[in-house]
């Protein structure tokens, strides 16, 4: 994934930037992601001090503190980077949306996996906190201000302190509901069809009457 893909991700999910160049120049969340990708590569090569230096200036410039050791997948979108904190052993999957003030933190000082794993297609609302070596399943939505401290299964919505599942999303049920909705008749379309049919019938009757009147 190139830096251009990260810019396109911003354009797809944020209506504010009007152009590629505007997103590239002024999106703090994008800057945080791009600078992290650079620092992460250096971190993996063992160039820890340079990686941490980039991390430091990224925090100063964007307001987001993303440890160089954290792993961010493709299509990660940070909207309003201010206050975002992502710890060293955090793993963030593909197409994850992160809003301002989000913390992916640890509850231990042990030299081991101590930060959350966020699966694909997750949305984390503003000022939500996810703590510990826990896993957030695919397609989960975490409400603004929530505090999550335990594993969350896929396809649910979580809110509150501590975070509780309030909505279970059944993808197959949603698909069938959409199919049924699409298959339902459109009253307006049916009415227009009836009107057009009536006009055709009237036109034929008028034509027939005109032909009869022409006969001697």
Give residue spans per PLM region.
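Terminal amphipathic alpha-helical/low-complexity segments used for targeting or macromolecular assembly
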Residues: 1-58, 62, 173-216
């Amino acid at each position: 994934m190139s830096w251009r893909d990260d810019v396109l991700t911003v354009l797809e999910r944020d209506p504010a930037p009007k152009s590629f160049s505007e997103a590239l120049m002024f999106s703090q969340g994008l800057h945080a992601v791009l600078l992290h990708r650079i620092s992460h590569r250096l971190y993996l090569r063992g160039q820890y001090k340079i990686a941490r230096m980039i991390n430091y200036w990224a925090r100063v410039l964007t307001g987001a503190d993303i440890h160089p050791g954290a792993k961010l997948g493709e299509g990660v979108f940070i909207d309003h980077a201010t206050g975002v904190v992502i710890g060293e052993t955090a793993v963030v999957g593909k197409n994850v949306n992160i809003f301002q003030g989000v913390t992916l933190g640890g509850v231990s000082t042990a030299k081991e996996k101590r930060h959350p794993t966020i699966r694909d297609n997750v949305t984390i609302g503003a000022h939500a906190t996810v703590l510990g070596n826990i896993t957030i399943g695919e397609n989960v939505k975490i409400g603004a201000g929530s505090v999550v401290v335990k594993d969350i299964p896929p396809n649910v919505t979580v809110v509150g302190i501590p975070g509780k599942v309030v909505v279970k999303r059944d993808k197959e049920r949603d698909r069938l509901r959409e199919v049924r909705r699409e298959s339902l008749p459109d009253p307006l379309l049916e009415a227009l069809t009836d009107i057009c049919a009536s006009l055709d019938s009237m036109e034929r009757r008028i034509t027939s009457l005109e032909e009869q009147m022409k006969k001697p």
